[in-house]
Swiss-Prot record:
Expressed in fetal tissues. GO terms for biological process: signal transduction. It comes from Homo sapiens (Human). This is SMAD5 antisense gene protein 1. Residues 7-19 have a biased composition (Pro residues). Residues 1-24, 43-70 are annotated as: Disordered. This protein is coded from a SMAD5 gene antisense transcript. It comes from the Eukaryota.
Amino acid sequence: MHKQPKLLPPPATPPPPPQSSSWSGNIVFTIKINIWLRVFSHSSPTGLPKPHSPMPSPPEPEHSVGKPANVQIPQVSSPEFCNQKSVLATEHAQT
């Protein structure tokens, strides 16, 4: 009984056009990257990132590269990749 309702939502994700999906994925990806960069930058001063991330030095350079990287994200990220991310997000939200 519980498996039936869970199987219904997943199939509803692929129907949307790939263009729309890819755009949404790119936007979400960019936002996630920005948040991650900000979190890492804020965590740097705390001193916790040392054990958390093996590269405590690159936080600053990464921030600068983040801007150009965001522009290339759409080219590097393919519709399939975005679709996978969407499916993962739906599964996580349901769980």
